Amino acid sequence: MDLLYIKTIVDKRCNLDVSLPVVLGVSGGPDSLFLLEVFVQLGFPVVVAHFNHHLRPEADSEVRTVEQMAKIRKCPFFFGESDVKAEAVSNKRSIEEQARISRYYFLFHAADEVNAQAVAVAHTADDQVETILMHFLRGSGLNGLAGMPFRSEEHGWNSTKPLVRPLLETWREEIEMYCHEKGLTPLRDPSNLDSQYYRNRIRNELIPLLEDFNPKLKEHILNLSQIVQDELAAKKSEILDVWVRVLAHQDESQLVIHTSELRKLELAFQRQVLRKIQMILAPEFRNLDFVTVERMIHNIQIPFSSASQDWIAGIHYFQTRKAVIFYRGNELPLDYESPQIIKKSREWDIGSILSLANGWKLKGEIIS
């Protein structure tokens, strides 16, 4: 195991400062235990954060085990929990998706509590391959084929703290070997063998089958991820320019997009705009597929309808003559194009002109 190479990734790709604290998501399994070892050896002020999903009988005892892992290494320990199964039913999500959402909310809350510079998780090269295959099977675009980045600023969980994944080029087999050589005893999650979970079926059934066709399948998929990430990075400034052109208005409740500007874009950029809208309004949603994107592109081309319609993940939209307005929640936002008074109360002398939002002006006179 080349720890010097991982240090280079932590420094250059994750862009972390060794003098500032980092919250580590630690389940106690081989990957996260290895991540904890690496960060302690590199000299980071480490905060160990463990989340109990209450999905398995042994989950409570695992909390104590991970707490002991932190104590041995003289690291502060944060603990969170929720009834993920009940939340999944209530929110109409899969257990996998709800577990991920609940866990990340907890991790970034812990990062805020200790003023950490980042949250680090132990996704490996194997996890990257599985993620890309999942995206591919769901009909993803280039963003899905890019997989997970080493450092993510726009993850949706926290606007100021990045999510970093230092182990994306480290294979699970290497980690297992390291744990064995160092006498480390990680926890084992039996649910990793349960085929009712989609990722497990990818890992335990699909990948071995595909490796019969090409034994270097995983290495090739990892290379594909890097190629796509580099391509997207090269186009980043161009995509930003497009976003500036189409965005009419943004606040905490809505995104307003210039319909005419959106329609003028090449199809590839229209797709990028829609994926960015989804990332801003529903960052926890990961299954934006080709059909959903194409249907929205088609809807935007037809004459406007003032009726609010559902899109995905609790995002709704309606069209005006000049814009399409995306929002989340049950409350219909104000029509951006209509005259609005921004402040709740405002003095106005009858006879004078009052400037409103969006270039509107209000003028009054007394008629006797």
Describe each model-derived feature in a short phrase:
Residues 124, 176-219, 223-226, 308, ...:
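Mid-to-C-terminal catalytic subdomains of enzymes
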Residues 1-208, 237:
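Core alpha/beta nucleotide-donor-binding catalytic domains of modification enzymes
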Residues 2-30, 44-47, 51, 82-84, ...:
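AMP-forming adenylation/ATP pyrophosphatase catalytic core
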Residues 58, 99, 167, 171, ...:
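Catalytic cores of large soluble enzymes that bind and process phosphate-bearing ligands
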